[in-house]
Amino acid sequence: MRESEPTVVLGIDPGTAVTGYGIVRKDGHNALVLIECGVIRTKPSDALAHRLSDIHDGVAELIRRHKPTVLAIEDIFYARNVRTTVVLGHARGVILLAGAQAGMDIHEYPPSEIKKAVAGTGAATKLQVQFMVTRLLRLKSAPQPTDAADGVAAALTWALAPELPKIEPIRRLAVMETRRQH
């Protein structure tokens, strides 16, 4: 791909109840634009298989509409509850399937790497991640809910990878700013 061609990235924060997503376009001059963000919600009363189908269909629809070429997804974390980890793995599986079916370039990032990429520390709070997503994309307001901001952060992790050394001072300032606010 030539450097001047824009890349559309779909970032995903997976979950069985709420899956956050963010679609970011990166042009050849490294300008980043938020195209869309939001959440895919499933009904807790539905059987797991139906919820997974809804997640797959929601992600497939985003891919169909926006035609991203890159999928950046948060990797699984290890919860104390083994069932939670297994169920989250199922959600990730159907999301990865949708990306693979579309021929996307797939990148998986641990939660701490996503936090570090956008907020400067792997221990960043959801508020700090949300604040930096807003700053980095020059948004008027923070993406809501936080699951959507986390999806955008996943997309930014891929998009910012070559730029991370240059934005480190900005992230440090943002972490200090959010600490002052609380």
Task: Set out the residue ranges of the language-model regions.
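Phosphate- and other anionic-substrate recognition elements at nucleic-acid/protein interfaces
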Residues: M1-H182
